[in-house]
Structures are given as C-alpha cells and as structure tokens.
C-alpha cells in the first residue's frame, strides 16, 4: 500500500500532463503530494526524511511551474533533489565517516564496512547519473520527452539500481550448508 501511494502523484501528473499540459499537471502534482503526505502521516505515524525533502521540493517547484507555466522549474527540482541526495551520501561517507545507506538498510542487513561504503558510493553515483541524464534530456529534448523520462525513465533506472544493489548484497548473505 505504501509503495503504491508513492506512485499516485506521479501517475496523476503524467495523466493530467497528457490531457491538459504542464500547468494543470503541476497543480495536480502539488495537491496529490500534499494529500499523499497527509495520508502517510495519519496512516503510518511519520514521514521519512527523504519523503519530506521530496514533498517540499515538489510543492515549491510545482507551484513555480504552475505560476509561470514553465516546465523548467520541475526540471530543476529533479536535478536539485538528486544532487542533494548524492551530496548527503558523499558528505556522510567522507566527512562524517558514515555510509548513510547503512542507516536505511542496516537494521535488516549485516554487511562488512567496506561493502556499506561501496554501496553508499554506488547510490551516490546513481543519483549523480540521474541528475546528469535529467539535465541532458531537459536541455536537448522536448517537454513531452522529458515528462515521459521523469514518469517512466527514472523509475526504470531506480529499479535497475535496486536490482544491482540486491545482487551485490546477496554476495554477503550467509550461505546455508545443506
């Protein structure tokens, strides 16, 4: 249920964009994101920091996009959020000597410190890649192509990164000796 709830604003954004354009899609995205945050707060008692960052960014840049009827603000949001996530992971690892990805997954999974560090760097690299691909597509392709990329391309990239992470973690899981 929680994962499905996270996709609803994006699905609504894509649908309204195709029917009515960027201004209405941005307004729909802002409203759906606020409703999503309220549901998460009521149903689960809290909202994760990552979701708060995304929610604030969606509302801020979505309102700018709606007000100016200009997609570039939502395009900036994607770039800025991914840059922020990469910076947080890199600062955690190199300044505070803590791979922050461990805080997300470390309760369920035990890995050696070097594995956490590589995983942390991998996700930081993934966020930088998403940021760069977003910049490229937003600058060199049409608004329609960018909306398709934002709606489906980033999801595909994230699923692939998650699959690679799972394969990487699997190498460190205890092996049964039957």
Curated annotation (Swiss-Prot):
Main location: membrane
Encoding gene per record: yciB
Protein family (similarity comment): Belongs to the YciB family.
Entry keywords, A to Z: Cell inner membrane, Cell membrane, Membrane, Transmembrane, Transmembrane helix
TM annotation in the entry: 19-39, 51-71, 76-96, 121-141, 149-169
Matching InterPro entries: YciB (IPR006008)
Topology of the protein relative to the lipid bilayer: Multi-pass membrane protein
Location in or out of the cell: Cell inner membrane
Record protein name field: Inner membrane-spanning protein YciB
Known function: Plays a role in cell envelope biogenesis, maintenance of cell envelope integrity and membrane homeostasis.
Listed GO CC annotations: plasma membrane
Domain of life of the native organism: Bacteria
